[in-house]
Amino acid sequence: MKIASIDIGTNAVKTKIFETGPTLIKFIQSERSPIRLGKEVFIEGQIPKEKLDQLVAILKNYKEIFESLEVRDYEIVATCAFRDTKNSEEARRFIEHSIEHPIRIISGLEEAKLMRLHPDAENNQTDMFVDLGGGSTEIFMREGSELAIGSFNLGAVRNMLGMDKPSEWKRLQRFLEKHKKPERIIGIGGNIRSFIYANNVKSMNQNKFLKSAQAMQSLSIEEKMDQFNFSPDRADVIDHAIIIFSFIMQKSGCKKIKSTKWGVSDSIAVKLFHEIYSQKIKIIN
C-alpha cells in the first residue's frame, strides 16, 4: 500500500511517497515546489490570496500524482509560515475546501518532537538533531530518559529578510548552554544538505565548517548558482541558514556536523504508517 506526506514549509512545499507493508516503509519518490510563503508572512503579516492560489495549484498537482501512483492515504502538515500568518485559520479553510483534504498546522515543539522518528534518533544519547527551515529552527536531543526539544523563530528566509530578533538569538543561546554538549549535530533541511554536498564530504568538523561558510559567504548569488548548481531559491538563503548552524555549533561546543535526507515529510509518513498498521493489531485488555 502506498502512502504519502506533504510538508507546506516557509520556502517550499515538499511531498514524499512511500510503499508500505505491515513491517516495512520504503521511500519511492519526492517532489519539491518553491513558493516561499514566508516572504509575505514575515513582511506583511499574512499570506496573500495569490500565494494561496499558487499553493492550491501545487497541492492539486500532488493529488494527481498520488492518483496516478495509486496512493492510498496521505497527510498534509503546515509549519512556520502557517503558524505565523495572521490569517492562519482562514487560509487553512480555503486550502482544505479547495483540495478537499484536511491540513494540520503543527506547533514548533511538535515539529521538533517529530525528529524522534528519525531512524538514528532512538536511544541516541550523543547527537543533537537540528531542523533548520525557512522560518524556524527546531532542536531535538535525548538526555537520559528526558527529551530536550526547542523551537526558535530563526530561519533562512526570516533571517534573509532581517526579521530575526536579538531576543530569539539569546533564547537559542540559553537553550544550548542549558543542555549537554552533543558529540555531533545531525542537520536537517535542504540548506545544510546543499552546503555539505557542495564541499564534497559527508561530514565536517567545526573548523572546516566555519572556514567553508566564510568562503561561501564571499560569493554572490549568481556565483553560488554557477559553482554549485544551486537553484535561485537556495542560493539567496543558504548563507543565512549556515550562519544559524555556525552559531549552534559554537554555542553548543559541538565539533562535528553531518546532514541527512530526512525531513518533516519523512516523520509525518512514518507517523501515518504507524497509525495505519496499528489498526490491524488486536488489543486485549
Show the residue positions of the predicted features:
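Short glycine-aspartate micro-motif
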Residues: 3-7, 127-131
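Short N-terminal binding/cap micro-motifs at the start of the first secondary-structure element
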Residues: 12-14
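Acidic, divalent-metal-coordinating active-site segment for phosphoryl/phosphodiester hydrolysis
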Residues: 135-141
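Short, glycine-rich, amphipathic interfacial segments at transmembrane boundaries or analogous
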Residues: 34-35
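Dinucleotide-binding Rossmann-like beta1-alpha1 core, especially the glycine-rich loop
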Residues: 76
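Active-site neighborhood of HAD-like aspartate-dependent phosphohydrolases
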Residues: 4, 17-20
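Beta-strand initiation motifs
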Residues: 23-28, 146-148
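Helical "lid/coupling" subdomains associated with nucleotide-phosphate turnover
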Residues: 17, 40-71, 79-117, 121-126, ...
